[in-house]
Regions:
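Core catalytic alpha/beta fold that binds nucleotide/phospho-ligands
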Residues: 1-191
Length: 191
């Protein structure tokens, strides 16, 4: 789904807290509002009634009484991860990544890894894999993406706390703390 109607958003608004309604309506476009609401409803489905959240100094929302959670959405789907320890998730569609975007968001090693793939689709897949890993890491750390260019994604997942998965036309990555396992609950849904 790449669009949502005002009617769909209006149907979802009564199903979430006043705080989440306010957050959703801050999105300029209807589709952003829709994704914000649907992702919160998916979180509610996983953990039950969701209390109002607070924000850390970098703007990351958290539940004062736990659990830790992370939400991501793109035009193709929504992903939610929860755990007893800090966790980050990102989901992205596999799509064309232009050279300018690659240069702005990837370090030299990552750029080389992307460009050395056997085909353009494999390069796009590798870009999505690295992008979601970076995004998941900054979400797990709760620091936001202001440090994106400096972040060194560890390519060898056997030595890192990052798991990356591909499902149909999108890739999602989960970054989790040293003390937690990958037993976190993860739910994805297509829009």
């Amino acid at each position: 789904m790449e669009e949502a109607t005002d009617e769909e958003v209006q149907c979802l608004l009564p199903l979430v807290s006043a705080q989440r309604r306010e957050q959703a309506l801050r999105y300029k476009h209807t589709f952003g509002q829709f994704c914000c609401l649907k992702s919160w409803l998916l979180l509610q489905q996983l953990i039950g009634e969701v209390e109002d959240f607070e924000y850390n100094e970098h703007g990351k929302p958290f539940l004062p009484n736990g659990p830790f959670f992370s939400i991501s959405h793109c035009k193709e789907g929504i992903a939610v991860a929860i755990d007893d320890h800090p966790i980050g998730i990102d989901i992205e569609a596999i799509r064309h990544a232009d050279d300018d975007l690659i240069a702005r968001t990837m370090n030299e090693l990552e750029q080389s890894k992307i460009k050395n793939q056997k085909s353009k689709i494999e390069s796009d897949r590798e870009f999505a894999r690295l992008w979601t890993q970076k995004e998941a890491i900054v979400k797990a750390q709760g620091v936001g993406i202001q440090s994106f260019e400096q972040l060194q994604t560890i390519i060898d997942n056997r030595k890192s706390n990052i798991e990356t998965f591909e499902k149909e036309k999108y890739i999602y990555s989960i970054a989790y703390g040293k003390l937690c396992s990958i037993s976190a609950k993860v739910q994805t849904t297509e829009l």
